[in-house]
């Protein structure tokens, strides 16, 4: 193709993303678009076709962003190249959403016509506005008996400030409205900007590791072109490679001769070093270099931390390799080596939330065959010493002694909860029990309210969301953003087994809740630790003060069974000997903590 033909081709490219609150039918609607445009053969079509992980299908959620090229002939006979980027809906994966939006000019905002606008819908709208995207609202699931289109259109106008008359009607189940959606993408979303004659600038928005091809970055070409044989340079790592293959996703890889401005695809260059490819980096030409990199992404900081330890200690290196490979297409994951007296060698790992933590653990188990034990999740605390020094603590066992601490600050979040009006009391009671401060209550309509709370982040990482869902019969939706750090009355609580501190069970608790937490943990451990030949005390302690205790009674062997007759002195002698033996066992005995005890403790909090 000559330059003029490439410029004409660029005018027919449309890059769009699909954003929605979790479970609003986003992946199903994407399936219908792919089916209608003939992108996927009906014979190989399956539900959630863009959700490539088994884990995504099982849970019915999207975890990773996915890109696919669609060819569409519009009603005016013109052929268009569309790049659809499917995104996750869960709050933990909003980073994946922001990455995909940076590769687009427009977005379909999917709203469930039976549920209306939810907390994550709002968050996604703000993200799209920040990225200057054209928003096309789509009311999905209109075939449901409970769908209320006029009411949701009113919400679009009042809550989002968008024109309700421009909202489209669709059903991912039946395929209703797919033609209208495609036509609106063509007319309302602008073609990508970019100059084919400028030096190459390509934004890396994702990457993964292929055992044959090495590291494969997913890219959006902004300026210039790239083809097989080109020498390219990664601007952040300064590493140079020769391109082996370029192509697009359909959703499998399709090899192309070149990629030009507006194209969304992939390149391979036999990259073996995982550290050379960073999401958000810019690829340029080695021979005709761009002066400046593209604006990447706001780096997401991990907010929930826990220790991950291999159940089989000889699998430590496999766990390390697993985390390195997962970090390739999940740049928000961070980890560093750590060791525990109770669990051996492992990694302190940072996540964007509890679901993110759960998904990573499951992927390590499925994709790499390593079973892991996770310690209790915690957040980053700001600890100020009496000398005025500031420490960042993400591991309770690293907290200095009480005498050295002047104050501790913990992160708070601004929570947005949307629920039916009848559940206001239950939501407020739950939030107050979690040390929340009510900020605002706003009625969206006569039945639904939006409640804003200020909550300590450490409180919501333990079962807050699950309790919220069960109290509101699943009708509440929840979104949050990190606010600032505030001073709190926090202390380190140690758990002792047989008089020894188990470092993996230490946690930081608020003074007012220390007794209940300690009592609950001791009771759980008593239930899950098997009996030994000696008595085991389980204690919860704040410093030197024991605040809760449970005792696992010793198993008793009947040492008098072999006696017959009535020789009471012999009986006493044997029982005395057993008593001495148990005393010795108690001082020398080690208590093994089973993995199910760890999991049960996480569930109690």
Curated annotation (Swiss-Prot):
Its EC number is 3.6.5.n1. It is a peripheral membrane protein. It is found in: Cell membrane. GTP binds at residues 23-28, 140-143. Keywords: Cell membrane, GTP-binding, Hydrolase, Membrane, Nucleotide-binding, Protein biosynthesis. It catalyses: GTP + H2O = GDP + phosphate + H(+). SUPFAM superfamilies: EF-G C-terminal domain-like, P-loop containing nucleoside triphosphate hydrolases. InterPro entries: EF-4 (IPR006297), EFG_III/V (IPR035647), EFG_V-like (IPR000640), EFTu-like_2 (IPR004161), G_TR_CS (IPR031157), LepA_C_sf (IPR038363), LepA_CTD (IPR013842), LepA_IV (IPR035654). It comes from the Bacteria. Gene3D superfamilies: 3.30.70.240, Elongation factor 4, C-terminal domain, Elongation Factor G (Translational Gtpase), domain 3, P-loop containing nucleotide triphosphate hydrolases, Translation factors. The keyword NAD does not apply. CDD domains: EF4_II (cd03699), EF4_III (cd16260), LepA (cd01890), lepA_C (cd03709). Signal peptide: none annotated. One of its GO terms (biological process) is positive regulation of translation. The keyword GTP-binding applies. Residues 11-193 form the tr-type G domain. One of its GO terms (cellular component) is plasma membrane. One of its GO terms (molecular function) is GTP binding. Required for accurate and efficient protein synthesis under certain stress conditions. May act as a fidelity factor of the translation reaction, by catalyzing a one-codon backward translocation of tRNAs on improperly translocated ribosomes. Back-translocation proceeds from a post-translocation (POST) complex to a pre-translocation (PRE) complex, thus giving elongation factor G a second chance to translocate the tRNAs correctly. Binds to ribosomes in a GTP-dependent manner. Belongs to the TRAFAC class translation factor GTPase superfamily. Classic translation factor GTPase family. LepA subfamily. This is Elongation factor 4.
């Amino acid at each position: 193709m000559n330059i003029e033909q490439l410029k004409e081709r660029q005018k027919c490219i449309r890059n769009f993303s699909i954003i929605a609150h979790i479970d609003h039918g986003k992946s199903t609607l994407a399936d219908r678009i792919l089916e209608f445009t003939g992108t996927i053969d009906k014979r190989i079509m399956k539900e959630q076709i863009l959700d490539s992980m088994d884990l995504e299908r099982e849970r019915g959620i999207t975890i990773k962003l996915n890109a696919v090229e669609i060819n569409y002939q519009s009603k005016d006979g013109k052929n268009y190249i569309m790049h659809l980027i499917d995104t996750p809906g869960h709050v933990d994966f909003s980073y994946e959403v922001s990455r995909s939006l940076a590769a687009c000019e427009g977005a379909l905002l999917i709203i469930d016509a039976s549920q209306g606008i939810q907390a994550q819908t709002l968050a996604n709208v703000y993200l799209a506005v920040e990225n200057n995207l054209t928003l096309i609202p789509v009311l999905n699931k209109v075939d449901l008996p409970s769908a209320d289109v006029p009411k949701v259109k009113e919400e679009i106008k009042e809550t989002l400030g968008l024109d309700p008359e421009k909202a489209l009607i669709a059903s991912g189940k039946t395929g209703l409205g797919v033609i209208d959606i495609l036509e609106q993408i063509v007319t309302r979303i602008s073609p990508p900007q970019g100059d084919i004659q400028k030096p190459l600038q390509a934004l890396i928005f994702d990457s993964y590791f292929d055992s044959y091809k090495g590291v494969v970055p997913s890219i959006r070409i902004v300026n210039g072109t790239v083809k097989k044989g080109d020498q390219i340079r990664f601007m952040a790592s300064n590493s140079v490679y020769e391109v082996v293959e370029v192509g697009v996703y359909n959703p499998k890889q399709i090899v192309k001769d070149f990629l030009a401005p507006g194209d969304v695809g992939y390149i391979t260059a036999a990259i073996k070093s995982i550290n050379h490819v960073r999401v958000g980096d810019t690829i340029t030409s080695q021979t005709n270099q761009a002066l400046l990199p593209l604006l990447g992404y706001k780096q997401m900081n991990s907010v929930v931390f826990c220790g991950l330890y291999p159940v089989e200690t000889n699998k430590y290196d496999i766990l390390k390799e697993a985390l390195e490979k997962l970090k390739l297409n999940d740049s928000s994951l961070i980890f560093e080596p750590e060791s525990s007296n109770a669990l051996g060698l492992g990694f302190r790992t940072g996540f964007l939330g509890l679901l993110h933590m759960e998904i990573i653990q499951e992927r390590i188990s499925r994709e790499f065959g390593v079973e892991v034990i996770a310690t209790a999740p915690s957040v980053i605390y700001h600890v100020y010493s009496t000398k005025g020094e500031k420490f960042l603590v993400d591991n309770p066992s690293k907290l200095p002694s009480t005498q050295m601490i002047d104050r501790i600050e913990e992160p708070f979040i601004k929570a947005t909860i949307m629920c039916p009006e009848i559940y206001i009391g239950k939501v407020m009671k739950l939030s107050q029990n979690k040390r929340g401060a009510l900020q605002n209550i706003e009625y969206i309509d006569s039945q639904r309210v939006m409640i804003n709370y200020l909550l300590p982040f450490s409180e919501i990482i333990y079962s807050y969301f699950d309790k919220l869902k069960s109290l509101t019969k699943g009708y509440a939706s929840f979104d949050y953003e990190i606010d600032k750090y505030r001073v709190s009355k926090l202390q380190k609580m140690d758990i002792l087994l047989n008089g020894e501190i188990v470092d993996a069970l230490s946690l930081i608790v608020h003074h007012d809740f220390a007794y209940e937490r300690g009592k609950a943990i001791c009771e759980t451990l008593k239930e899950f630790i098997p009996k030994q030949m000696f008595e085991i005390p389980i204690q919860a302690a704040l410093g030197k003060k024991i605040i809760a205790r449970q005792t696992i009674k010793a198993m008793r062997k009947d040492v008098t069974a072999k006696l017959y007759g009535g020789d009471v002195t012999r009986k006493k002698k044997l029982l005395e000997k057993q008593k001495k033996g148990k005393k010795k066992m108690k001082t020398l005995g080690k208590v093994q903590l089973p993995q199910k005890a760890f999991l049960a403790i996480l569930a109690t909090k």
